[in-house]
Amino acid sequence: YGKLCNHALTGNADCGGLISYNYISGEPITGLADGRPLFVRSANDKFNLANFMRTHLYASVGVLKIGNDILFNEEKIKVDRITGHGGLFKTKGVGQRILAAAINSPISVMETAGEGGAWGIALLGSYLVNNEKKQSLADFLEDKVFTGDAGIEISPTAEDVAGFNTYIENYKAGLPV
């Protein structure tokens, strides 16, 4: 997967017009009651391996992009930092760059970024058991888990952001399919 994920970054920033939907079940953010995994393209799209892989990576954060656009643009929510964690970040720099483009924000990851859900659940368990100061989860993580580890940060490029924005508009336009 590492080679394929890295190859995806050589594709067009807008995935060459290709679109992928990874819905196994319904998705309330996009108003779909049922899931239908789907890959679509038109005859004029740039169908190649790099764009095919990139569209699947984009699809993995498509709904996150739509939800964050609501939070950031409509609700005016501000964040101090976004730290990525989970399988998307297993291949160094790839998921980070994709997510940075999606939400137009720098993304930090730490050495444990690829560990995924079990690691996150263990952190929540530690928070419940070892939170003597009754700190908020954010403060507990900052003080006990991430102390001194700012991680590695990747900022979005203008080309990637513009490409993802084009992709997500095509993605939203194709939802009725």
Where are these regions (language model features)?
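Glycine/Thr-rich phosphate-binding loops that ligate phosphate moieties of nucleotide
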Residues: Y1-V177
